[in-house]
Regions:
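Residue cluster at the C-terminal edge of the helix-turn-helix DNA-binding motif
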Residues: 44, 61-64, 122
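Extreme N-terminal segment that seeds HTH/winged-HTH DNA-binding domains in transcriptional regulators
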Residues: 1-34, 40, 89-93, 99-126
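A short alpha-helical element within helix-turn-helix/winged-helix DNA-binding domains
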Residues: 34-45, 59
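Beta-hairpin "wing" of winged helix-turn-helix
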Residues: 28-29, 33, 61-70, 76-78
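Short, cationic-aromatic polyanion-contact patches
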Residues: 13, 37, 71-88
Length: 130
């Protein structure tokens, strides 16, 4: 379910957010589905409950989830989830950096493009199987 890399430059908090976003955007966490409680998730992924709470608050701020007091945190309607301009710019920058790395490694533009399309197709196929 979660992939946390303790050696990553990204904080654990950011990695928790990224993992949950991916689960939501790929449909593995369905609209209206209740997320594990802060305590449950922190125990499952062995992180501090404050880290999970902070991630849940940020996901709520971004519109990925909503919280009902005393009931829990739930996945928001995917059709209403919109990445903000900052996130889109960051994702585009990461893609650009990876693409330039392919070219730096000596691949042609067409070879790099083929790899990008292959990765996108693999992602789509794995999402279809879930």
């Amino acid at each position: 379910m979660f992939q946390l890399d303790l050696k990553s430059r990204k904080s654990i908090y950011e990695q928790v957010i990224d993992n949950l976003k991916e689960l939501i955007m790929t449909g593995r966490l369905a609209q209206g589905e209740k997320l594990p409680s802060v305590r449950e998730l922190s125990k499952t992924i062995t992180v501090n409950p404050n880290t999970v709470q902070k991630a849940y608050r940020e996901l709520e701020r971004q519109g990925y989830v909503y919280t009902t007091s005393g009931v829990g945190t739930f996945v928001a309607d995917r059709d209403e989830i919109r990445a903000d301009a900052r996130e889109l710019a960051a994702a585009k920058g990461a893609f650009d950096e990876a693409f330039r790395e392919f070219l730096f490694l000596g691949l042609s533009y067409e070879e790099a493009k083929a790899i990008a399309l292959e990765i996108m197709e693999e992602r789509r196929t794995s999402n279809d199987q879930d």
